[in-house]
Amino acid sequence: MARWCPPANRSASAAATCSSVVANTACMRWCKKRSQCPARRTP
């Protein structure tokens, strides 16, 4: 998990964080696993 990926208990921060760094596969996978962030695809 990347350092800027927030803990699972911070769902609000997770959504905000992954929203801006969704391009990162590691964070995106982490978000999708917890269903905190929408599954967005980037080119």
UniProtKB/Swiss-Prot annotation:
Membrane-topology descriptor: Single-pass membrane protein
Residue ranges of the TM segments: 12-28
Entry GO terms, CC: host cell membrane; membrane; virion component
Subcellular location: Virion; Host membrane
Keywords attached to this entry: Host membrane, Membrane, Transmembrane, Transmembrane helix, Virion
UniProt keyword Disulfide bond present: no
Function description: May initiate with G7P the virion concomitant assembly-budding process, by interacting with the packaging signal of the viral genome. The assembly-budding takes place at the host inner membrane. In turn, G7P and G9P are present at the end of the filamentous virion that emerges first from the bacterial host.
Protein family: Belongs to the inovirus G9P protein family.
Record protein name field: Tail virion protein G9P
Source organism phylogeny: Viruses, Monodnaviria, Loebvirae, Hofneiviricota, Faserviricetes
Protein's gene: IX
